[in-house]
């Protein structure tokens, strides 16, 4: 009986000791929240200090961005748009709001009807970043279900990356008018096993 009481007491003391530490940490950390008037932009990938953290529309609630106080570089990328980059200052315990507006990239090249091919992705987790020929295209759920990716016919290297998972890479060579499906579930791994594309500036 004494041992049970001791364990219960020890657990209570540990919890009480942990609570102030958690509260103190929440007071130190700042939060970053995004907004954009464009639905397309809200689906863009977000990098903070060179690390991919997810797509904009999911970075809230349980997936909110908590940052240490100080300067941080934010990059937002979307296929067909110029990269948006900004250095922000995060204050302790404060919420930093960032409104993102992106410009369409006039250099973007789109496949013509004659040489267009389709890629359909069935990938988990669906929040993983997708790159085609090292260019960020979107997150996996953008190209699942009834949605497809249109690429030019010919050889392409497709990479799928997410922090905490091993990078998936495959090569496809679709013909004009052909639909190719890529199906995989990423394997969990350490952050050091993540590919360089989700860490790039």
Regions inferred by a protein language model and the residue ranges of each:
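Bacterial N-terminal signal peptides
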Residues: 7-17
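Short loop/turn and low-complexity linker motifs enriched in small/turn-promoting residues
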Residues: 21-201
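Positively charged n-region of N-terminal signal peptides that target proteins for export
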Residues: 1-6
């Amino acid at each position: 009986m004494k041992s049970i009481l001791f364990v219960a007491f020890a657990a209570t003391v540990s919890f009480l000791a942990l609570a102030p530490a958690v509260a103190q940490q929440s007071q130190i950390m700042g939060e970053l929240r995004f907004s954009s008037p464009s639905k397309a932009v809200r689906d863009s990938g977000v990098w903070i200090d060179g690390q991919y953290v997810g797509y904009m529309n999911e970075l809230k609630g349980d997936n909110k961005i908590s940052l240490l106080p100080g300067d941080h570089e934010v990059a937002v990328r979307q296929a067909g748009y110029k990269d948006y980059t900004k250095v922000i200052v995060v204050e302790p315990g404060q919420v930093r709001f960032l409104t993102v507006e992106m410009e369409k990239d006039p250099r973007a090249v789109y496949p013509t009807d004659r040489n267009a091919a389709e890629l359909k992705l069935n990938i988990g987790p669906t929040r993983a970043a997708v790159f085609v020929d090292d260019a960020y295209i979107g997150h996996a759920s953008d190209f699942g279900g009834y949605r497809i990716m249109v690429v030019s016919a010919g050889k392409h290297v497709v990479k799928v990356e997410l922090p905490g998972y091993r990078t998936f890479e495959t090569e496809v060579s679709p013909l004009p008018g052909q639909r190719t499906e890529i199906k995989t579930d990423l394997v969990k791994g350490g952050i050091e096993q993540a590919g360089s594309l989700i860490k790039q500036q």
